[in-house]
Amino acid sequence: MHILEIPSFFTPYGGEFCLEQAKALKALGHEVRILSHVQLGITIGLKDFFLLPYRRYEHQREGITICQSFQRGVPRMIHHNMRRWVSVVESMFCDYVNRYGTPDIIHAHCAKWAGYAAMKISQTYHIPYVITEHLPKMMLSVEFGDCPEKTWQVPLLKSAYEAADMVVPVSEELVEDVSCYFGTHYRWQFISNTIDTDFFHYQPRSSCEGRRFRFCCVADNSYRKGYDVLIPAFRMLKEQGCDAELRIAGRKTDTTGFRSHLSKGITSLGQLRQEQVRDLLYQSDALVLASRSEVQPLVLLEAMSTGIPVISTSCIPQNLRIEGGCTIVPIDDVEGFSAAMKQVMEKPFNDGLRISEQVKAMASPQAVGKKLESLFRSLLS
């Protein structure tokens, strides 16, 4: 099959799940490329806004050809920016067809706005399209608010959902989570995101006996990630005399303001490269994530894939709650989170290999690639 991936956002603003799925499909013998048009924000990254290329170009990344373009967003002009973004994606698709031919299927990541662009392309070229949805209500509500009937965006995105040949939420809970915006009158099938289980392979840990227990957290500094719960929970743990340390990594976790809230035993590492994240996991005994809203946090899968248990909150989807490897605490429960950390410290953990194998069966590139392949073939038959 000839598959074109279109992400709603991509490097330098994340979106690596698109690349991972493209690699998984290419490994199965398919022709796969990525069409990436990224809107840059002057308030998000001044350097990127001015220095990234102003022209369209192609480049290779981990064996995948990426047709790349950047758009400078105009502050407070959401409607203008969206129309321009979709128009450029349509133009890039035309260029793509002239060079590589018409793809058999379009795989858009997130309805806002790759899914909407895919719908418009599908109407012109009569190509089936699939939307994999990654965004939870908490992230969408920042722009849409709690009154979807008053926003111009929601009807457009809802139409993209309803016209899609299939919507693929990365967790089953996501369907209900975003139903206030998109309803449920569309075809959907759950397929997990993928992680590189060979890269995040299982590795035995040394015994915790006679040394400090090592927690880690890999998450950007944002309200959604719950650092205002995790930090006091860890402080409470230390006040009980527990010998533990917590190392934090993620964007904006190395700012002066963030570090001023850290207590004894907590180290902030800032944003890390993928190899550094893996090293941090291998040096840790458990990962903690006190999130308020998640769809499918890949760092939990990555941690369990390396063989360590995780502690998170009730916003985590059921498919991540691997028995013996994932402890769940209510959202915003400082005392409960601290108690869970203490329990993990005191309970010997010997299930690392079993949990790693379960993650591989659900989220390895081969497992996810085969599920996507089967879905795409069924839509084309």
Give the role of each language-model region.
Residues 326-334, 342-349:
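Conserved acidic donor-binding segment of nucleotide-sugar-dependent glycosyltransferases
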Residues 4, 168, 207-225, 231-235:
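Conserved donor-binding/catalytic core segment of Leloir-type glycosyltransferases
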Residues 309-312:
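Short hydrophobic beta-strand element within catalytic cores of glycosyltransferases
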Residues 256-275:
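Nucleotide-activated donor-binding/catalytic signature segment of Leloir-type glycosyltransferases, i.e.
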Residues 1-60, 238:
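N-terminal subdomain of nucleotide-sugar transferases
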